[in-house]
Design a protein with these regions (language model features):
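Compositionally biased alpha-helical segments
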Residues: 1-375
Length: 375
């Protein structure tokens, strides 16, 4: 992540930005949404609609999530509030919510390799951009690898234990009666042994490690950012093996690869056979193609930008089938985006008609690419 930080003293600090554990354009920024602009269509929804939190009048609070590569600027307007600008010019006011992204200090790696921390109260604005060709690469590099599960393999940037995300980060554990820490740059593979791990170094040396959450069943999960899918988080129960790979084996997007977001557009087919085409608002929440659909399959969680989704079909109260570009198919559950807790879909049809479809009445949703929208 690269950008220019303007402080309240009008200093401009340019460099690579570390935001908590977020380092890369594919990492996810999360904050709380303020209000819901789609409640103005409450009369269209009808008085018999009960939202997923059990209240009649207002839907539950939703989170805003997108990848850092979609963000143009962030302006600090309060200790827990920001104005976030996305590519294309739209600006949204957001609050801290359950996320810790708002209100914390950030670190900037300068051109000379030194780092400078900036506390939240001293930040005026952050403007993101591609790093100039003249600036050296950052000192640290991401963990690139393949994660194997019983259901398949995931190849991308890895965040271990939802914490360690760079080659200089340390994998902690115990061997025999003493503690040991190994930098990820020295690790070739990590194999789960249930409540311990077999760690193989690039040198060929094998380490049997146990006793810390990096290497046992208390691990919080292994996140993999896949360039054209989104983020996958594998729970320890489903984790089998991690293998490190060279970074150049990944086709990583750069800042300019993230296009300006567009409205969701497609067709909703209802269970009584009605076809409704137009601009969509999904779960009375997500309205742009850079926002994320959340769901789980067993111990594996998915966060998928809507721009990669092509079809969404609710199968029952608990599960939804989705199809991504690239012919990937998944069955997802647990999260309100893909269960009976979904608050329904608004369809803005040509001519100004607005139609609300309850989730229980949705048979299929087809989402179209920008090319299709312009046809």
């Amino acid at each position: 992540i690269y950008g220019e930080v303007t402080t309240v003293m009008n200093r401009k600090i340019c460099g690579y930005i570390t935001w908590g554990k977020k380092l890369y354009w594919t990492d996810i920024f999360t904050a709380g949404k303020i209000g819901n602009p789609y409640m103005r269509y409450r009369d269209i929804m009808g008085d018999n609609v009960r939202f997923s939190d059990g209240r009649r009048d207002t839907p539950p609070e939703h989170e805003f999530s997108c990848r850092f590569g979609n963000i143009r600027s962030i302006r600090v307007i309060g200790d827990r509030r920001i104005e976030l600008g996305v590519k294309g010019g739209n600006v949204t006011e957001l609050e801290r919510g359950r996320s810790l992204a708002i209100g914390n200090w950030i670190t900037v790696e300068l051109r000379d390799g030194k780092t400078e921390s900036v506390v939240w109260d001293h930040i005026s604005e952050i403007v993101f951009s591609a790093a100039p060709d003249t600036i050296p690469e950052p000192k640290d590099h991401p963990i690139a690898g393949i994660v194997e599960t019983p259901y398949g393999m995931y190849k991308g940037l890895v965040q271990w234990d939802l914490d360690e995300n760079s080659l200089d980060a340390l994998l902690d554990g115990r061997m025999e009666s003493s503690g040991i820490s190994v930098a990820f740059k020295n690790i070739g593979s990590i194999k789960s042994l249930g409540n311990s791990s077999l760690v193989t170094l690039h040198s060929g040396r094998e380490l049997y490690m146990w006793g810390e959450n990096d290497v046992n069943a208390t691990n919080r999960g292994i996140a993999i950012n896949l360039p054209s899918v989104g983020q996958v988080i594998v729970g320890w129960h489903d984790f089998k093996l991690f293998r490190s790979i060279p970074l150049d084996q990944l086709n990583l997007p750069v800042y300019d690869d993230f296009a300006a977001p567009v409205r969701l557009f497609g067709r909703v087919e209802t269970r009584n056979g009605r076809l409704l085409e137009g601009v969509l608002v999904y779960d009375l929440d997500e309205a742009m193609d850079f926002e994320l659909l959340d769901g789980q399959n067993g111990n594996i969680s998915y966060r998928i930008p809507f721009k990669y989704l092509r079809k969404i079909e609710p199968k029952n109260y608990k599960y939804t089938w989705v199809k991504l570009s690239g012919e990937i198919e998944l069955v997802l559950g647990t999260m309100c985006d893909v269960t009976a807790a979904n608050d329904g879909v608004l369809v803005f049809r040509a001519g100004g008609e607005v139609v609300y479809v309850r989730w229980r009445d949705v048979k299929r949703i087809e989402l179209w690419t920008k090319v299709k929208q312009n046809d």
